[in-house]
Design a protein with these regions (language model features):
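Sec-dependent N-terminal signal peptides
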Residues: 4-13
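Sec/Tat signal peptide C-region and signal peptidase I cleavage site
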Residues: 15-19
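N-proximal helix/coil linker or "cap" segments that precede and/or mark the start of modular domains
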Residues: 20-34
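Thiol-based oxidoreductase modules, predominantly thioredoxin-like and allied folds used
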Residues: 35-38, 60, 74, 81-108
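A short beta-strand-turn-helix
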Residues: 37-55, 85
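Short pre-active-site segment immediately N-terminal to redox-active cysteine/selenocysteine motifs
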Residues: 52, 60-64, 121
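Conserved redox-active cysteine motifs that mediate thiol-disulfide chemistry
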Residues: 60-76
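Non-catalytic, surface beta->alpha helical segment in thiol-disulfide oxidoreductase systems
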Residues: 74, 112-174
């Protein structure tokens, strides 16, 4: 039986991004590099809570990581993936660029989450559920992780499998 890890993330939601803080030096709002992706874990949490969908976080080096660019082109940019994602997950891009600066609070958020998930290479994709405790801290239930997988079907089948196993594990645990 697969264990589901439930860990308390000691980052208070209010310390993350607010709308005014996610601004680049040129005054533009910082956004993900693809439509449908969020950059603010708080907004992703709220959307996940509202829809009941897990969060899929893409730890990427958008401007330097060859495998990240390949995954984006071969999977994330395809309509088949976009349709699947809209039905199944909340997408979050956690970027670690080298050629441009992120807003400081986004940078802190991304590094905190990378440290929490022990990300050591890119791309790394984590699928997880989030909740908040009484103190305003996030609890994260990790469902699984993956990296570069060639093709939309192989990628989405892998993520679907993670989600299905986690749900089955919860059901099995509830029966005992």
């Amino acid at each position: 039986m697969r264990k589901i890890i439930i860990i308390t993330l000691a980052i208070i939601a209010s310390n993350f991004v607010s709308a005014q803080d996610g601004v680049l030096a040129n005054g533009e709002e910082y956004k993900a590099h693809a439509e449908g992706w969020m950059v603010d874990i708080n907004k992703a949490y709220e959307e996940s809570k509202k829809t009941g969908k897990p969060i899929m976080a893409n730890f990427t080096g958008s401007d330097w990581c060859g495998w990240c660019k390949k995954l984006k082109a071969e999977v994330f940019d395809k309509q088949e993936f976009k349709t699947w994602a809209e039905k199944n997950v909340i997408l979050v891009e956690l970027d670690f660029p080298r050629r441009f600066k992120l807003p400081e609070n986004i940078k802190q958020q991304n590094y905190s989450l990378a440290g929490f998930f022990k990300v050591t290479g890119y791309p790394t994709i984590w699928v997880f559920n989030m909740s908040k405790n009484e103190e305003g801290k996030f609890n994260i239930e990790a469902l699984g992780k993956t990296g570069y997988v060639k093709g939309v079907k192989a990628f989405t089948d892998g993520v679907d499998n993670m989600i299905t196993k986690a749900e089955a594990s919860k059901t099995d645990g509830a029966k005992k």
